[in-house]
């Protein structure tokens, strides 16, 4: 979980700095025949610019999501849940850093978005982490995979181990 989070958070930070340096004050840069564009947008709202101007709300929500996931994360015993939590935590943290430290003021900062696909709002790597990590969480939940790796139909692991009980193994 930690390695995934660090890799995404670092990638998000570096790519935002590149976007600020190379795309500021320029027209969108097209690549792949116009399929992918790089354009700099400062987003004061949530995903897809919903709730524009409610930065304090999104800042608070992101902080709560990170805290809850960090509190729950010690129970994770599978790579699937570790990767999904790492992606969501890093994505939320990447955009939270923008909200806390970018203009116009602390807690009111705008998120740096710079990736644009046709018929889609501009986004960044942190957004990709939140979306992909959330999709993995939903997929694992729908399949009944618990944080400890057991299925909802199995008995959970013994406390302090990753091994299922003998009864669950024999079923």
What residue ranges belong to the model's regions?
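Alpha-helical transmembrane bundles and membrane-interface segments of multipass inner-membrane proteins
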Residues: 1-171
